[in-house]
Regions:
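Flexible, low-hydrophobicity surface segments
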Residues: 1-164, 182-185, 270
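C-terminal catalytic domains of large/alpha subunits in multi-subunit enzymes
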Residues: 2-6, 89-90, 233-238, 268-275, ...
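Glycine-rich loop/linker segments at domain edges
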Residues: 27, 32-40, 166-202, 293-378, ...
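Short acidic, glycine/serine/threonine-rich loops at helix termini
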Residues: 96-101, 134-137, 216, 225-227, ...
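Helix-loop-helix junctions that connect adjacent transmembrane helices in secondary transporters/permeases
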Residues: 152-232, 398-482, 693-705, 711-715
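A glycine- and small-aliphatic-rich helix-loop capping segment at beta-alpha/alpha-beta transitions
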Residues: 220-221, 229-233, 256-267, 293, ...
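Thiamine diphosphate
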Residues: 247-272, 276-278, 496-504
Length: 788
């Protein structure tokens, strides 16, 4: 066995002395899979070569939203050529439940179905066509029960998946009683389909001793590992999850990915053959949960100048038929019901309503967007009622730096950038001049009306379940100076792997092309937290940084011993390692370490310090820090049709010291457009019987390129490091930009309000579809006729 000899390469050393490392943190490196994505070379689960004997799975879904199952006859399925196995709940060897926190999510329906689209049976066959035909051949009979579909009705009937929860500060009733002005209202916020490009997919290969190799498109490999083990009745060490990349996630693969993996595992163990399940787009949209729709009621007390003195908000989330993650999601909506504003005395109540729809789940922002939309609606309502400028009102109520800086859940708002960001964006977007210009335009334009809004974002970063704020990483250095990297995060296109490679390159001072990242693997880094809550780079980046520092310190100690020098005389820079007067390439040092029996692998670990939250008391510090941003959006509406266009958007967003500005700007742009889609064109529709009607791209409209503002200006806050000890003082960027899209919705309300001379608030439900915009115009036009 031969290894590299530790000889110096003088030319390499001279060249690397001359130029700084080109690929560490702070540089706009391209996405590590960018070329593979555009060329089609990036392999997803469905691209893997088919193994001999591979079985394809297809589900048969419930045809009713609420019914008892009276008969299941799978005999006809076996008459279809190629059908090998049909699964019912009786074929589950372990626990027939995939609830992430509490039981209540049956893998296969037993005696009752709780929503239209619930999986009742699964057929395994030698081809996808045979599996589909087999699933359609089964005979399933029901006794139909009455479904509960409306969140307001569920709230009235106290139909909950979890008890209501309250955040309270001060005496809100007394504050409302003494307020010179009181404003009340209610409205609906729609849900949102994840619409990831790759639908829910899993491939399971059986091994010896009941071991299972699971390839799962999941944001949460450890949870899939745990649930597969429970469903199969085996231990977790017999299940290994492999996840190289997802074709999108957005939260929809945090808990929802486990079901298909578990079904494949049953078939693989039952038949001894590899099993794959890739849901069709229609089945995926019918089976899986969405962003939670919300019903919001509010009552606020306001001083003459618009200052909030008392706020009461009820947030009723439509959770679907089971808990899933709804407890934490509605909690986060409550945490963000203040957004950027000091509420005064406040009571925020969260309701987790149970309905006969798919169990709603995580989605980018995790409830935070719904909470923010509630308070932004309130701000616009106050501005119209009191005749105040919406931006001036918002700034009047911002959190302060020295006082008025405690949230309604009793966390201090630190490193507050709201004033600075708003002032900079107000100037760069020319807000005041455009506001005057738009009012003049609307006064002379009878049919087209323009609207403008500038809204802030203050988003808390951390899992609110504190134990999840931890991560691990594994780094291996080989004797040729190359590095293999594994961590507990998952790549879904957001650039996480690219950033973590840059972090390791920065610590070791080597180029990124020397680092190879491998699939997320529960056999390498165990007990991972989900890649969610904008924590991917914060947690896994810190763990990788820790592992790299351990290895660098080991190398440093070795060189100190070899050269009888102090650690301060050893430096890693630009691919060169200096020890006293001696200079080495990084590969030389790796070879020396091996020859001197220094271990060249290290496990890194990180946990977020200082966060805590007492849920019973409704107080604590659930967030490590806040990310800030603001967006200014201009729209134009057609008052005859309700159609509209986004004309311009100016965005200023805080990412701390950016790890990769190009990726961060991409996340801001994408998050903004996705947020705009949620609040404008993405409408979920159910029939009176509970059938999900918008179950494909023909009926469910995500933003197209024509929906993006023609003039989109994105700027990152410069020269502002995160004061917290995050990875190289960066800030999370996954979720906060999503809420920037609220500015578009507020701008639409501003345009509609102009029809009534800005004297009435249109209070549009979200999404603000052209139909809703037109109805708002007609209502205000009628109300305007009644004005004295």
């Amino acid at each position: 066995m031969s290894h590299n000899r530790p000889e110096l390469n003088e030319q390499v050393i001279k060249a690397q002395h001359a130029a700084a490392i080109q690929s560490g943190v702070g540089r706009s490196n391209k996405h590590e899979s960018a070329e593979k994505h555009v060329s089609g070379e990036a392999r997803f689960i469905d691209d893997k070569p088919e193994l001999p004997g591979l079985l394809h799975l297809c589900p048969r879904l419930s045809e009713h939203a609420h019914a008892r199952i009276t008969r299941i006859d799978v005999g006809p399925c076996y008459a279809i050529p190629g059908v090998v196995s049909v699964l019912t709940w009786q074929d589950v060897p372990g626990i027939n439940d995939v609830g992430p926190l509490e039981p209540g999510d049956p893998l296969l329906a037993h005696d009752k179905v709780e929503y239209l689209g619930q999986i009742v049976i699964v057929v395994a066959a030698g081809s996808p066509d045979a599996a589909r035909a087999g699933a359609a051949a089964a005979v399933i009979e029901y006794e139909v029960l009455g479904p509960l579909l409306d969140v307001e009705q569920a709230l009235a009937q106290n139909s909950f998946v979890q008890e209501p929860h309250v955040h309270q500060r001060g005496d809100v009733e007394a504050a409302l009683a003494r307020a010179p002005h009181r404003i009340t209202g209610s409205f609906h916020i729609g849900g949102q389909e994840h619409f990831y490009l790759e639908t829910q997919t899993a491939l399971v290969i059986p091994g010896e001793d009941q071991q299972l190799q699971v390839f799962s498109s999941t944001q949460n490999p450890t949870e899939v590992q745990k649930l597969v083990a429970e469903v199969m009745g085996i231990s977790m060490n017999q299940v290994t999850i492999d996840m190289r990349r997802m074709g999108g996630g957005f939260g929809g693969k945090e808990t929802q990915a486990a079901g298909v993996a578990c079904l494949c595992a049953i078939v693989a163990r039952q038949t001894g053959r590899a099993a794959k399940m890739r849901l069709s787009r229609r089945d995926d949209m019918r089976i899986t949960g969405k962003r939670h729709p919300f019903f919001v009621r509010y009552e606020v007390g306001v001083e003459d100048d618009g200052l909030l003195c008392g706020v009461k908000i009820d947030l009723a989330g439509n959770c679907g038929y089971s808990l899933d993650l709804s407890g934490s999601i509605v909690d986060r909506a409550m945490f963000h019901a203040d957004n950027a504003y000091y509420l005064g005395d406040a009571r925020i109540t969260g309701y987790r309503c149970r309905t006969n729809t798919a169990s709603n789940t995580a989605y980018r922002g995790f409830g935070g967007p719904q909470g923010m939309v509630a308070i932004e609606q309130i701000m616009d309502h106050i501005a119209r009622e009191r005749g105040l400028d919406p931006l001036a009102l918002r700034k009047r109520n911002y959190y302060g730096k020295q006082d008025r800086n405690i949230t309604h859940y009793h966390q201090q708002v630190e490193d507050n950038l709201l004033d600075e960001i708003t002032e900079q964006l107000e100037q760069s977007s020319d807000y005041q001049a455009r506001r005057a210009e738009i009012r003049a335009f609307n006064a002379r334009s009878p049919l087209l009306k323009r609207g403008l809004a500038l809204t802030p974002v203050k988003f808390g970063i951390s899992f609110t379940s504190s134990f999840l704020n931890q991560a691990g990483a594994l780094i291996l250095i080989y004797t040729d100076g190359t590095v293999q990297l594994n961590h507990g995060g998952t790549e879904m296109g957001q650039g996480l792997n690219t950033k973590i490679i840059q972090i390791v390159a920065e610590v070791l001072q080597i180029e990124v092309d020397k680092i190879q990242i491998t699939a997320t693997d529960t056999g390498k880094v165990p007990n991972t937290s989900p890649t969610a809550a904008s924590s991917g780079a914060d947690l896994n980046g810190k763990a990788a940084q820790n592992a790299a520092e351990i290895l660098r310190d080991r190398m440093t100690q070795m060189l100190c011993q070899l050269h009888q020098c102090d650690a301060s005389e050893v430096s890693f820079r630009n691919g060169i390692v200096r020890a006293g007067e001696k200079h080495y390439t990084f590969a030389d040092v790796a070879q020396l370490a091996w020859l001197n029996q220094v271990p060249l692998s290290a496990n890194g670990y990180y946990r977020v310090p200082g966060i805590h939250y007492d849920r019973l008391a409704g107080r604590g510090q659930p967030f490590y820090y806040f990310a800030y941003g603001a967006a200014c959006c201009e729209v134009v509406i057609d008052t005859l049709t309700g159609e509209y266009r986004l004309l311009r958007a100016d965005i200023l967003h805080d990412v701390g010291a950016s790890l990769n500005p190009a990726i961060d700007i991409g996340q801001v742009e994408g998050g903004f457009v996705q947020g705009v889609g949620w609040l404008t064109c993405e409408e979920l529709v159910w029939s009176e019987k509970g059938q999900f009607l918008t179950d494909g791209p023909a009926s469910y409209k995500i933003p197209a390129i024509s929906d993006v503002p023609a003039d989109l200006r994105v700027t990152l806050v410069e020269n502002r490091k995160n004061p917290q000890d995050t990875v190289f003082h960066s800030k999370a960027v996954g979720e906060p930009p999503f809420m920037l899209g609220i500015a578009a919705w507020c701008a639409l309300q501003d345009a509609v309000a102009s029809v009534g001379g800005y004297a009435r608030h249109p209070q549009l439900d979200a999404p603000a579809t052209p139909e809703r915009v037109l109805n708002g115009v007609l209502q205000l036009a009628g109300a305007c006729d009644d004005l004295p």
